[in-house]
Amino acid sequence: MDLLNNAITSFEPTAQEENETWVYYSIGKKLKKQGWKIHISSQMTDALIIFEKVSKLLLQEKCNFKVAKNSTVLAEINSPRNDTSTANKFITIYPNNCKEARHLIIKLNDLLKDYQGPQIMSDFQLGINSPIHYRYGGFQARRVFNQEKNKIIHMIEDDKGNLVEDVRGSTPYTPNWVVPLFSEEEKDYYFSNKKETIYNSKLQNYHFISILKKTNRGNVYRAVKKDTEQPVIIKQARPFVGNSNDEKWMAINELKNEKMMLQEFLDKSYTANYVDDFYLEGNYFLVQTEISGKNFFEIALRNGVSTKQKEQYIQNIVQIINELHREGYLLVDLSPTNFIYKENGQVSLIDLENISNEKAPVRRVQTPGMLNQDTDLSIANIQQDYFALGMVAIAILIGHVLPVSKGDGKLNLSSMQKVMLVIDLAVESDDLTPYQSSWIKIVLKMSESTQTSQNIPMLLEDRSESLPSTLSNHSFSYDFHKEIIEITNDLLNRTVDKHGRIAKSSEFGEFISPLSIQHGLAGYIVMINKFYHGRSEKIKNLITQVNEVNNLLAPFEYENSLLFGRSGYLWSLITTFETSTDPDYLFFCEQIVQNLMEQYKNEKCVDFALGKAGILLSLMKYSSVIEDVQVDLFIKENIEEIFNSFSTISVNNLMEYAFAHGKAGLAYVLNCYSRIYKDDIYDDAINSFSDFIADVIRKQLLTGFDKLKSLDYFWCEGFSGLILYLCLVKQEKYQLLLIKAQNELFKQHLNMGTSYCHGLASLLQTIAYTENKELYNKIVIILLTRSYRDSNDYLVFQSECPSQSVFDFGTGTFGIYWTILKEKFLFSLDRKSKR
C-alpha cells in the first residue's frame, strides 16, 4: 500500500489537479507568473510525515503548491541517476509575494528542523542537509524553442518586461534585477548556514581539471594530485540522495561499495587503484587512479575501430567476467559504459559501485537495454550478467545499445525473442557477421539456463558453427486494427485538461499548440475518424471542449502551420466532415479557413511543415471538398510565391531539398496545385526537380547510407522524405529505384528510431506506395521489438525517448500504427467532387 499516495489523495482542498507526476493544489490566490518558489526535498522514509506537516501549514496559510503524486514518482525524482531539473523536488510551494515567501520559509524551517533531505542543486538550501530550498523562477510555464541549441528554454520576465531565460543550473542563481530573499547575515541568523571550508579538507590536495559527469548522486571529476602530479578520478556522493525505502542503500553506500571493490581488486590489472576517500559537508569523495583510453561513446563514434579490434574488446571483457564469476562476484550493472577501451584491444573495468558477492546479490540499478525485462529485476543473478554481456557485445559491434522493449504475452513475443529477431536482421543488414550473431545467441541463451555458473566461451574460439535465423520460423498473432480501436475509444472518453490536452506529449509537443496534427488533437482525430467510425458526436464533443480551452491560451509558435497548428487541425476536421457530413464540422472548418487567410500575410516561413506552403495545401484540401470561390482565388493568388521560393532556394545540403523544410515539400505542394486545378504551369519545374532528386538518391546508393547523421534517414529532413516525394509525384517512373533505395536505407534500421517524422515509420510510409512486401514485414518486426503494453494494456511503441511512449502522430504511437496499417501519406490530396 502506498501510504504517501493515500495521504495525498485524501487531502482535498479546492481545485485539485494532477498529471502523471504531480498533484496540484490551488488553495490561495491565482498563481503568479513568477516569483520566489520554495522546494521541499525528502528522504523516502520521511515523505509521508513531511507531506502531512507541510500540507497542513499551507492549508492554514492559503498557499498554492504541488507534490509528487506517489512513492513511485518520488523514487524516480530521488534517484541518484536523475539528471533532470526535477531531482529531489518533492513539494513545490508558490508564495504570493516575497513577504509571504520569507514568512513561510521561517515557519517551515522550524516545522522541519528535525528532518534532513537531499540537496536541490539549482536552489539555495537553508542549511547543510536542510530539506528546505528556494529560488527565483517561473510559476507558470513560459517557453521558447531555441533553434541554435535545439531545445526548449524556460523563460521569465526581467524588470523591463522582456523574456529572459529562467536559469536552472547546478548552482543557485538570482537574476540581477531581483533582490535576494535573505541577506547573508539573515541566513546565518535564521538557518545556521555556516559551511566547512575546503581548506580544512583533503580536497585542497587536488587540482581539478574538469567535470566528467553530473548526476543527482554527485559529480565525477578529472583531477591531479598536487604532490605527485598523478592523474586521478574523484567521485562524489551527496548525503541523503537515494530512493531506497529503508535508507540502507543511498548514494554514499553505493560509492563506498566501489571503494571496497577497488581494495578487493587491488591485484587486478584491469581496474583502477584506490587512492583516498574523505568527507566534506556530508559529501563523500572517492579518489582513484585515472585509466587512459576511450569511453564507449568515443569508440562508437569513431569510424576507425576495426571489427577485429571490437572483437578483441569483447574477448577481454569475457575474460574479466569469467574471472570475477569464478571468484564469486556478480557485476549486476553491466553495460558498455563500464569499460575503458584501449587502442591495443585491452579494456579496463570502471564504475564498480554495484558489483556484489553472489551469496548476497542485490539489484538496485536497471540500466536500460541491458536487462531481460521479462525476468524478475528485483534480484541479481549470474544469468542476468550473461544477458547483459550479450547486449554489451551487440552495442560494441554495432555502435549503440539495442532499444528492445519488454515482451508481450498477447503477441506471443518475449523480450528474448525480440532480441533474437533484431540480431538476425542485423546479420541481413551486414551489421553483424553470422559468427558474431551465433556467439551472441549462445551467451544470451546461457541467461535462460538454470546452471548457477558457466564458463562463457570466447568469441574467437570456434567460427565454424552458426545458429539458424529465427526470422523464417516465428509467426506473430496480432490485430493492429483492434489494438488501435481500443486506444482511440479510450481517448474519446477522456476529459480535456487546462492545457487543451487529453493525453501527454513530449516536452516539445507540449510547447506547441494542443490542436496540432503532429503532437495533439488533430492527430488523434485523424486516427479516430479513420479507424473508429460512428462516433461523430463524441468527436464533436471533444473538439468543442478543446476549442473552448484553446481560446483561453496564449499564442503558440507556428500556430497556423500544417504540422504544429491550425492548418493541420483544419485537415483533420475536413476528413471528419467527409465521413460524417455533419454541418457542425463544416462550420468549424469555415472559421479556421477564414482565420488562415486573414493571417497568411504575417507568416514568415514558406516551407511545407511550418509555413505558407503547408497552409496553402490545407486550403487546397478544403477546396477539394467544399465549393468556395473565395478560397480558390486566394490559393491561385498566393501559389506563385511558393514557386518563387522553390525556384530561388539554393541547394547546398540535404535539409535544403528535404520534404518538411526544403524544396521537396514545396514541389509537392506545387504538384498538388497542378492536379487540383488542372494547371500544368509548374509541371516542367516539378519534373526537372524530380529527376534531380532521383539522381541524389542514385549517388547516395553508390556511396552508401552508413555515414549519414540520424536525421538524414527520415521523412522530415532526410532520404525517407525524398523517397516519399518520388512516390507521390513520379512513382511509376522511379519504382525500381525507390525499392532499391528502401532496401538499402533499411540497413540503417539500428540507427533509426520508431516515429513517423524521425524514425522507421517514415520509411514504412513509403512502402504503402511501392508495395515492397518483404521489407514491410521486416520493418514491422523491428517496430514490434520496440513495442510494449502500457499500464492500460494498450500496445504502444517507443517514442523519441525509448523509455517513454506518447500517442502523438508525428513522434509517437499513432503515426506508427498509421504506417503499419498501410495507410497512404496523411497529406495526400486528390481532386474530389465538391459538396
Q: What does each model-identified segment do?
A:
Residues 325-342:
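Catalytic-loop of the protein kinase fold
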Residues 313-314:
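Activation segment signature within eukaryotic-like protein kinase domains
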Residues 150-210:
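Juxta-kinase regulatory segment immediately upstream of eukaryotic protein kinase catalytic domains
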Residues 355-425:
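C-lobe/activation-segment region of protein kinase-like
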Residues 7-21, 183-227:
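ATP-binding glycine-rich phosphate-binding loop
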Residues 273-284:
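Short beta-strand micro-motifs within the conserved protein kinase catalytic domain, predominantly
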Residues 260-270:
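Structural motif at the C-terminus of the N-lobe alphaC helix and the adjacent alphaC-beta4 loop
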Residues 36-44, 209-211, 216-256:
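ATP-binding glycine-rich loop module of kinase domains
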